[in-house]
């Protein structure tokens, strides 16, 4: 592989110096920007970052052997990272979206055959090959929007066979697609209909059968639970998360989306790497999260699509909670693959600054999936994952909302998107 020399970026947004701990409070606005910046890459790794004149002098005798990318007038950032998706599923639910727009309640949609169980049915019935192809198309779209790493949850199988199938597809995507896929087991996404009269039996199935097998096969790094009234209680979630820890799976938690339910407190108690949603988290829960360094992953696209109030990002940031952003890509409440759009929504609906939003979609997102030592910032020794945007500065990526400014994506030192087209 020839060296790669990215030169003369109008803004090179490095986010350097935050690999050991996520950015919090006012530090989220310090993006470590280099004007007229350049990056030298070899064998998929960043070798040097700095002003163009410095790197041009340092590598003067080697420029002839490198592939040179002229980034004049453009903004270069770390590859974007999506730390909360439900990437692998079958089918879509636009019909229930129409029902919701006409005033139908969630229970009315469920009773009409919609909701999560509709996706569970479609995902169970889909072949592994069909799931792979459908999910690969979504992953291509993530890549086209500057995303180089995604977290992917199971949770639409809700059976031993179904959950394993989803995770096997996620692993295959990771092995075959430029985008890195980091897998999370979410067997505790809901209680499936066939277990509605024996929910504790389903919980035991998760703890005693699913988790050990997922761990044995190396199909996931994280174990997630949807902790919400009517889904899984804090006590049930604690049992499931502790069972995962016993098998080497790091806890994550869907927390306090609908009402204050102790999810944020539980995340701190069990040492979760992240707590996600947090629309209704208590002040005490946020205080404990900040003390334990639990990342708060916010999902403004979900609130936007459901036409509800978004999480109070300013409250989290002011409490010292490290904040990350994610699409929550899923067919029911956030059918989007555009992390830049989510960043715009974070500014418009949650009053985050553009700098905070970019930090939340890069280095803090890397912390939320345990990858801050290798991705999330542009520093020597890190993996060469970068996005080049046709934007004069990083703010324009979000300011011109709904526009995909991604011109080029580099993954592991290889150009995988060029002029808005995937070139795998």
From Swiss-Prot:
Binding-site residues, Fe(3+): 84, 86, 254, 328
Cofactor note: Binds 1 zinc or iron ion per subunit.
Cofactor or coenzyme needed: Zn(2+); Fe(3+)
Residues that coordinate or bind Zn(2+): 84, 86, 254, 328
Enzyme class: hydrolase
Residues the record lists as binding N-formimidoyl-L-glutamate: 156, 330, 332
The protein's name in its UniProt record: Imidazolonepropionase
Taxonomic source organism: Geobacillus thermodenitrificans (strain NG80-2)
Gene: hutI
